[in-house]
Swiss-Prot record:
Pathway connected to this protein: Protein modification; protein ubiquitination
A Pfam family reported for this protein in Swiss-Prot or TrEMBL: PA
Keyword Transmembrane helix among UniProt keywords: yes
Enzyme class: transferase
Glycosylation sites: N109, N132
The protein's name: E3 ubiquitin-protein ligase Godzilla
Example of a GO biological process term: endosomal transport
Extracellular side: 22-174
Cited PANTHER family: OS02G0798600 PROTEIN, RING ZINC FINGER DOMAIN SUPERFAMILY PROTEIN-RELATED
Organism name: Drosophila melanogaster (Fruit fly)
Side of membrane Cytoplasmic, spans: 196-536
Transmembrane segments: 175-195
Gene that specifies this protein: gzl
Biased composition (Low complexity): 307-334
Zinc finger feature spans (RING-type): 235-277
């Protein structure tokens, strides 16, 4: 239970007490007539109907009702002969047998000035009410059972009653015990909570302070002037120069201070050096273990000012195997697969990729430039000897192959169901666009046909590392990406038909050009092992 809950419960208890106090509308005072001495005082509660009591009270003599004490049928008239002529009388009747309204009307008809109704069971006070208040001209009050029995004993000319509607301070005795328990529980909970907070605060302060027992283990030296080993001549706490034979306490960081300056700082403030903020540990003191979570945001309290902000990246053999397999698959599948392999390998906190030397892609090394090979060779040698991971440039070039060539180079073959394009049955077939071959291609083909050479064949593209034909070691292309149609590449062959010597039609896909522009260069190279000729 929090402190706020205790306050709410206390407020509710006070409201209940105030509510009970407001129900006590006045009291009945018992005086001895001869001496005007107050004998006893009782609490009462005025009724909701009838006239109000006078401000200075109503002075009356009590007359109890005869058996059965309810006063529902009739009441004896007041005994005026024994009392003074100006005396007023109040009828004392018990609760029950009839409604309050009937009791008041019967007493009014019997010439009584007021009515006191006492409870038949218990001392609880209840505010009387009536359905028809017409014709009621006398006031009435309600008292407890004990009060009614006590007032019946004052049926004498020597005792007079004064009934008023003052609001005395009164607390119902039935609420004292629950209210006391409530206040006591709130107080105990508040004390326990404050003790807990104090202990926690003391532990926190003690953890950041140096105990006095440990303070004695720090060395104390005497200052000597003109000493070559003195690097500091001023105490940074009091800003006073050291004088001869001063007691200086030297911290583990080699910073000296006056003993009367640094001792209160370490024992009452924090156990850190005021200059370098290094935590002070004495000789032989056990240091708390530094525990960090993988997240940099979760730092324990045991970290001091010398704790590195970036922890070393943890790696294991399983990650090395994943990197090797992912790198070999990525060299065949293109840039998208290489990036996925790099993601599996993980990156450092500085953004550089890691990979193992055992799983290096031979295709990437064969397609790199001489400078890059020299750089990689210089970084591979120490990694090979130590067997650890090496860092490479995050912008390391990866093969950029078209999707269909990357699929041809992968070892895994697609299933029969994956080769079927079900979407083609539900969409319209695009119109076939025929791209005519340039004139120089026709002249070359006519020359080869006249010489009796066979028709041109198809040359396989051997794992190019870039889409630049002039220099495969350079990544990129001379074409703008906006000019390239989606899912097309300069390596995509275009089937053309050339007449052969025997009027046969053979598909030729050796000529490489884009669908929108002409080829960059065309050369007819004879093949040494056969009589076929290839166009590059």
């Amino acid at each position: 239970m929090s402190k706020r809950s205790c306050q709410i419960l206390t407020l509710l208890g006070l409201c209940l007490v105030c509510h009970e106090a407001t129900l006590v509308g006045g009291h009945v005072l018992v005086y001895r007539k001869a001496t005007s001495q107050l004998i006893e005082e009782f609490n009462d509660l005025p009724a909701q109907f009838g006239p109000n009591l006078p401000s200075n009270g109503l002075k009356v003599y009590v007359v109890p009702a005869r058996r059965p004490y309810y006063g529902c049928d009739s009441l004896d008239r007041p005994p005026h002969l024994k009392y003074p002529p100006s005396a007023k009388f109040v009828a004392l009747v018990a609760r029950g047998e009839c409604v309050f309204e009937r009791k008041i009307r019967v007493a009014q008809n019997a010439s009584y000035s007021a009515v006191i109704v006492y409870n038949n069971e218990g001392d609880d006070l209840e505010q009387m009410s009536a359905e028809n208040i017409t014709g009621i001209r006398i006031p009435s009050v309600f008292v407890g059972h004990t009060t009614g029995k006590a007032l019946a004993t004052y049926f004498t000319t020597e005792v007079v009653l004064i009934i008023n509607d003052e609001l005395p301070f009164n607390i119902n005795t039935q609420l004292i015990l629950p209210f006391s328990i409530l206040i006591g529980m709130c107080f105990i909970i508040m004390v326990i909570y404050m003790i807990y907070k104090c202990i926690r605060e003391q532990r926190r302060l003690r953890r950041h302070r140096l105990p006095k027992s440990m303070l004695k283990k720090l060395p104390v030296l005497r200052y000597t002037k003109n000493n070559a080993n003195n690097k500091y001549d001023t105490c940074v706490i009091c800003l006073e120069d050291f004088i001869e034979d001063d007691k200086l306490r030297v911290l583990p960081c080699s910073h000296p201070y006056h003993t009367h300056c640094i001792d209160p700082w370490l024992t009452e403030n924090r156990r850190v050096c005021p200059i370098c903020k290094r935590k002070v540990f004495t000789k032989g003191e056990a240091r708390a273990s530094r525990s960090r979570q993988p997240s940099l945001d979760n730092v324990t309290d045991t970290d001091d000012d010398t704790t590195p902000l970036l922890q070393q990246q943890q790696s294991n053999g399983r990650q090395v195997g994943q990197v090797s397999s992912a790198s070999s698959a990525g060299g065949a599948a293109g840039s998208s697969s290489s990036v996925a392999a790099a993601a599996v390998a993980g990156t450092t906190r500085h953004g550089t990729f890691r990979r193992g030397h055992a799983g290096r892609n031979p295709f990437e090394e064969s397609q790199s430039s001489d400078d890059e090979n020299a750089l990689l060779a210089s970084t591979v040698r120490p990694a090979t000897s130590s067997g650890a991971h090496e860092r490479i440039n995050p912008f390391d070039r990866a093969p950029n192959l078209p999707a269909h060539l990357a699929e041809q180079l992968t070892e895994s073959r697609r299933s029969v169901w994956s080769r079927i394009n079900f979407a083609s049955f539900f969409r319209r077939q695009p119109a076939v666009i025929s791209v005519a071959a340039p004139p120089y291609l026709e002249r070359v083909e006519s020359g080869t046909s006249a010489m009796g050479l066979p028709v041109t064949g198809t040359i396989a593209v051997a794992s190019p590392a870039s889409n630049n034909i002039l220099n495969p070691n350079l990544s990129g292309s001379f074409k703008d990406e906006d000019d390239m149609p989606p899912h097309r590449s300069i390596y995509e062959p275009i089937a053309i038909s050339t007449p052969a010597a025997d009027s046969a039609t053979v598909d030729d896909s050796a000529f490489l050009q884009t669908p929108t522009q002409g080829g960059i260069g065309v050369a007819a190279l004879p093949h040494s092992a056969s009589d076929r000729q290839f166009l590059i």
